[in-house]
Design a protein with these regions (language model features):
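Flexible coil/loop and intrinsically disordered segments
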Residues: 1-324
Length: 324
């Protein structure tokens, strides 16, 4: 034997003392559930896989074809990309809106994305608006005139809404995956359909290029900025988006400039203590968000290193002064 610690006695034990049991499950959602329940000694299923299994079970029988399509679309996605959508954005925003801690997304948090089954739930008043939206979107898209005009009506998802179980869950995740991909990283600077001011472009270009941007703490701060921007866009769209970029830049990166080091707790505390996400949730116009007062920094406040490019932006925007 090439490995002396694995000898003939071990082989004999495997051949004569061990058994292999095979389970065959024809339902994919049952397979996910069974695997997770039997896998306590191995690697857990990802939270988004558990959510997939849960929401597949929530499909009504008459949507079998749509269920198969949802499975196909989901499985065409890269698992790490789905994990990023949930862990970095959807989970954190939904928690911060309610002033709750949002460190790491785990299987213990999947209840956050379980909502109401419109085909089974009691007709409580709170479900009525969801039923109207759900049925109206389907009625519009299934009308014979759509064959002529080729129009479609997307469901009006909101980041902080009650989740509609089943098909709408999969549509919601696809919607936000596309939105995240269009608003984060370098994507927004290339969106010709979203005109931005020179200042907003300058900010985004700086965030995408300053030398220290790949440090762990700087990544956390970029996540703060991106989450605030995503939540704002989800509610107000392009309206005063350039001003929002300026506001969220100062709000997020003040935390970076005034900290020697940024940890996940630093990011989380800043998001919750500032109440920005709660402000966006309650606002009925962009003006209320943009009126958020922010501190002007001085040299005594600066603790971070290698941030000269961003300090210059703060100074140009009158949020940094050499002396008061």
């Amino acid at each position: 034997m090439a490995q002396p610690e694995f000898g003939e006695a071990d082989i004999a034990f495997l051949l004569h003392k061990c058994q292999v049991v095979t389970f065959v499950l024809n339902d994919i959602s049952e397979a996910f559930q069974f695997f997770d329940s039997q896998n306590s000694r191995g690697r857990d299923l990802n939270p988004h896989d558990l959510l997939k299994a849960y929401h597949l079970r929530e499909f009504p029988e008459h949507e079998a074809a749509l269920k198969a399509e949802a499975v196909k679309d989901w499985e065409s996605q890269k698992s790490h990309e789905l994990a990023r959508v949930f862990a970095h954005y959807l989970y954190r925003i939904r928690h911060w809106v309610n002033n709750q801690q949002a460190h790491y997304f785990s299987k213990d948090d999947i209840g956050l994305f379980k909502g109401v089954n419109l085909y089974q739930a009691a007709h409580y008043p709170y479900t009525q608006a969801l039923r109207i939206q759900h049925e109206q979107v389907d009625n519009y898209n299934n009308h014979f005139q759509r064959k002529l005009d080729q129009n479609t009506l997307a469901f009006p998802f909101q980041l902080d809404q009650i989740v509609i179980n089943g098909r709408r869950f999969f549509e919601m995740i696809a919607h936000y995956q596309a939105l995240i991909n269009s608003l984060t990283g370098e994507a927004l600077t290339k969106q010709s359909s979203i005109p931005l001011s020179d200042r907003a472009q300058q900010i985004l270009n700086a965030l995408n290029s300053y030398g220290a941007r790949h440090r762990t703490g700087d990544r956390y701060i970029r996540m703060l900025f991106d989450c605030a921007l995503l939540y704002y866009f989800d509610k107000f769209g392009k309206e005063q988006l350039s001003e929002a970029i300026e506001k969220f830049f100062i709000w997020a990166y003040s935390c970076r400039l005034t900290s020697h080091a940024v940890y996940i707790e630093t990011m989380d505390n800043h998001a919750r203590n500032s109440k920005l996400f709660k402000l966006i949730q309650s606002a009925i116009s962009p003006k209320q968000v943009l009126a958020l007062p922010l501190k002007t920094l001085t040299p005594a406040d600066l603790k971070a290193s290698k941030m000269g490019d961003l300090v210059k932006l703060f100074e140009g925007m009158k949020y940094y002064v050499e002396s008061k």
